[in-house]
Regions:
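Short amphipathic alpha-helical interaction segments
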Residues: 250-262
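Short, cationic-aromatic polyanion-contact patches
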Residues: 275-281
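Short helix-to-turn junction characteristic of helix-turn-helix DNA-binding domains
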Residues: 226-232
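N-terminal, charged low-complexity regulatory/assembly segments
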Residues: 1-155
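Hydrophobic packing positions characteristic
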Residues: 102-222
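Short acidic, hydrophobic short linear motifs in intrinsically disordered regions
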Residues: 232-242
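Long, positively charged, glycine-interspersed low-complexity recognition regions
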Residues: 246-247
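A short, conserved structural fragment
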Residues: 264-275
């Protein structure tokens, strides 16, 4: 199976802290436990989330408050627009803006102090049990958003030491495995109706630090998951799956040998210390 280049989100890995309203201080010399400060923080937070509903906080020039609220909402919205271009193209900018407004109003965006983690919070918002119920939105939207977000997650994942198994093989350290009820890798503007189809996709960085996408069969996805669980111990993974599938471990190892070669060629699987990946003998 051939890895393919996924959609280019153009998302920047900005690690600047997002200014959560609750963290605002009235002055450097004031104690954070003061009741007045706590009340003020709550007023600011409510207004920033719903400026058209909550009353404007007192103690600061209204124009400055409104400018800050607008900047905060626009910054959060810009990160979501950048990370989910395909979702936006398919549901329309107005629908995406409506989702961002609710996401912002509910305050789910400041679960992390880093702007680059806002898209993951937005995916969690779409996947939540109380996610927006709108018949005009496609049922696959949350899964497509997760698929688009995986590119950002892999692109910005830190470099970590390879976890080399006993056979001298290692999985790409930035590897993410996604499982979906819809064929998220084929959804496009030309699709009048998307038919459900169980889909597994491995998303990873190759040796040139390019994000690649590899669509997997259910069996291949189970093998990859077993390799992740067993520290890329190919024999242990085969033994685990063989007992589950009612096969001998050696028999299964022979059946998946071509897959090992393909993953090495795709650089999803690595042989550390070699200039080019080579299949195990």
């Amino acid at each position: 199976m051939t890895a393919r280049q996924g959609p280019n989100n153009g998302q920047q890995a900005d690690t600047a802290p997002a200014p959560a309203p609750e963290a605002l201080q009235a002055g450097a010399g004031q104690a954070s436990s003061a009741p007045g400060l706590t009340r003020m923080q709550g007023d600011w937070s409510s207004y920033f989330r719903q400026p058209g509903v909550a009353p404007r906080p007192t103690g600061m020039e209204p124009r400055r408050i409104d400018v800050y609220a607008s900047l905060l909402r626009n910054n959060i919205g810009s990160f979501i627009h950048q990370c989910f271009p395909l979702c936006e193209a398919l549901i329309g900018t107005s629908n995406l803006e409506a989702l961002i407004d609710r996401f912002f109003a509910e305050g789910r965006w400041h679960t992390s102090p880093f702007f680059h983690e806002i898209p993951k919070a937005f995916v969690d918002f779409l996947q939540a049990e109380d996610a927006p119920a709108d018949e005009s939105l496609p049922p696959w939207l949350a899964e497509l958003a997760h698929y688009e977000w995986l590119e950002l997650a892999v692109e910005t994942a830190p470099d970590v030491p390879l976890r080399v198994g006993p056979q001298g093989l290692a999985l790409c350290p930035a590897l993410q495995l996604g499982g979906y009820a819809y064929p998220v890798h084929t959804i496009g503007a030309e699709d009048a109706e998307v038919v459900p189809a169980t889909t597994f996709v491995a998303v990873y960085r190759d040796r040139q630090h390019q994000v690649r996408f590899n669509v997997l069969t259910p069996a291949a996805a189970q093998l990859l998951d077993a390799l992740q669980d067993n520290g890329c111990d190919w024999q242990a993974a085969c033994e685990q799956l063989a007992s589950h599938w009612g096969l001998a471990a050696d028999e299964l190892a022979g059946q998946v040998a071509p897959l090992q070669q393909q993953w090495l060629a795709d650089e999803l699987l690595l042989r550390p210390g070699t200039a080019q990946p080579a299949a195990a003998g």
